[in-house]
């Protein structure tokens, strides 16, 4: 378990997410002076042996400036156009600043669909690993130009967490315009107290997180806490800290008590189960009876058709489904062995009847335990 006191000694790979409010002139294009300061801090980390992956916002705000737009558009095609124009300036700014220190950068644009495909997921992981081995700093952003609502990450906090899983990062730093996670909303309660350190499984941290975001970005504090939970699947510790603090990254590395540190306190998932838990979009839902829920949660067993009481969605064999209890609470998710219409025929029946019901059998399990991940 990585704590604040041993961050310097034990962490070697960081994912740093920088929000649009910290990179732009209040939405009017990139703040080149601010970007130079961020790169300077990251160069300092590099000099202390830290491998860096950057997840950077700012392309839409830069595109708005270049196109002469004063308000963030709401239509997807206009957002995509702004992102396409602005991404050019964003990458140029990073490349220029890192080049002053003899460091190469690489642009990587991804969609959720890229990570949902196991082969492409592994290819992305291998590519980033190779870049890091060659001393290159990858700059990652969502591929807004081609993305649709169905394959969006939704915000760069989520993208940063999934990137941390992808590269098995030791530390995820989410930089924001707030000091960290408070026990209440500091914008409305002046007596709210900063949470310096907490275990990521702590039950009340989601309730503490404000869901209010700024006008330029999309992610509020709630998305940052959920990102920390996702990052914890790979054993990654998460800092949520203010980007307004001077020299914040080297100071976090030195162990200074800045921001909020959310510590992963559960056993990390295997690489395959991290992919299952974080990178696939659910195509359907199975409602389980009480016996099936207990079998999954207490015994780590596979899911049998007899334990399914209801279902919804439309899925094919091998696609992700969410398993819920009778109160609609998520229990697990996994890759289903039978498509929707066949699952509909065999649910509630013992596995010995599958061949009779379908005319063939592809195994006794609806979801094998190797392809199933329990809910946090």
Curated annotation (Swiss-Prot):
Q: Which CDD domains match?
A: AAK_G5K_ProB, PUA_G5K
**Where does the record place it?**
Cytoplasm
Q: In which pathway does it act?
A: Amino-acid biosynthesis; L-proline biosynthesis; L-glutamate 5-semialdehyde from L-glutamate: step 1/2
Q: Which reaction does it catalyse?
A: L-glutamate + ATP = L-glutamyl 5-phosphate + ADP
Known InterPro entries for this protein?
Answer: AceGlu_kinase-like_sf, Asp/Glu/Uridylate_kinase, G5K_ProB, Glu/AcGlu_kinase, Glu_5kinase, Glu_5kinase/COase_Synthase, Glutamate_5-kinase_CS, PUA
The PUA domain covers which part of the protein? 283-361
Enzyme kind, highest EC tier: transferase
Record keywords: Amino-acid biosynthesis, ATP-binding, Cytoplasm, Kinase, Nucleotide-binding, Proline biosynthesis, Transferase
Q: Which GO terms describe its molecular function?
A: ATP binding; glutamate 5-kinase activity; RNA binding
**Listed SMART domains:** PUA
Listed EC numbers: 2.7.2.11
**Which residues does substrate bind?**
57, 144, 156
Using the UniProt record, give the first listed, main subcellular location: cytoplasm
**Cited PROSITE patterns:** GLUTAMATE_5_KINASE, PUA
Q: Which domain of life is it from?
A: Bacteria
Sites binding ATP sit at 17, 176-177
Q: Could you tell me the Gene Ontology terms of the biological process aspect for this record?
A: L-proline biosynthetic process
Pfam families, from UniProt? AA_kinase (PF00696), PUA (PF01472)
Instruction: Output the Gene Ontology cellular-component terms.
Output: cytosol
**What protein family does this chain belong to?**
Belongs to the glutamate 5-kinase family.
Listed PANTHER family? GLUTAMATE 5-KINASE, ISOPENTENYL PHOSPHATE KINASE
- Function of this protein? Catalyzes the transfer of a phosphate group to glutamate to form L-glutamate 5-phosphate.
Q: What is this protein called?
A: Glutamate 5-kinase
Q: Which organism is it from?
A: Hydrogenovibrio crunogenus (strain DSM 25203 / XCL-2) (Thiomicrospira crunogena)
């Amino acid at each position: 378990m990585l704590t604040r006191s041993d961050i310097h000694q034990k962490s070697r790979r960081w994912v740093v997410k920088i929000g649009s409010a910290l990179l732009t002139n209040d939405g009017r294009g990139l703040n080149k002076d601010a970007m130079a300061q961020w790169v300077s801090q990251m160069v300092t980390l590099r000099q202390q042996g830290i491998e860096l992956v950057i997840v950077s916002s700012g392309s839409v705000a830069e595109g708005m400036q270049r196109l002469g737009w004063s308000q963030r558009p709401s239509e997807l095609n206009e957002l995509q156009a702004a992102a396409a124009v602005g991404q050019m300036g964003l990458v140029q700014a990073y490349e220029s600043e890192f080049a002053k220190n003899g460091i190469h950068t690489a642009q990587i644009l991804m969609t959720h669909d890229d990570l949902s495909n196991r082969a492409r997921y592994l290819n992305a992981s291998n590519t980033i690993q190779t870049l890091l081995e060659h001393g290159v700093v990858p700059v990652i952003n969502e591929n807004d130009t081609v993305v649709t609502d169905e394959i969006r990450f939704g915000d760069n906090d989520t993208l940063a967490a999934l990137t941390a899983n992808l590269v098995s990062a030791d530390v995820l730093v989410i930089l924001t315009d707030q000091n960290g996670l408070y026990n209440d909303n500091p914008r409305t309660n002046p007596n709210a107290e900063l949470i310096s350190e907490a275990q990521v499984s702590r039950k009340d941290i989601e309730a503490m997180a404000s869901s209010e975001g700024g006008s330029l970005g999309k992610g509020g504090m709630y998305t940052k806490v959920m990102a920390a939970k996702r990052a914890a699947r790979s054993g990654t510790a998460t800092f949520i800290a203010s980007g307004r603090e001077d020299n914040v990254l080297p100071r976090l590395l030195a162990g200074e008590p800045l921001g909020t540190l959310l510590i992963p306190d559960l056993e990390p998932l295997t690489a395959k189960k991290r992919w299952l838990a974080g990178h696939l979009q659910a195509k359907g839902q199975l409602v389980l009876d009480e016996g099936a829920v207990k079998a999954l949660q207490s015994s780590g067993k596979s899911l049998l058709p007899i334990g399914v009481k209801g279902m919804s969605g439309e899925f094919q064999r091998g696609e992700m489904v969410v398993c819920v209890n009778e109160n609609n609470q998520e229990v697990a998710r996994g890759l289903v062995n039978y498509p929707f219409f066949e699952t509909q025929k065999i649910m509630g029946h013992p596995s010995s009847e599958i061949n009779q019901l379908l005319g063939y059998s592809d195994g006794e399990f609806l979801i094998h335990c190797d392809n199933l991940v329990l809910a946090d």
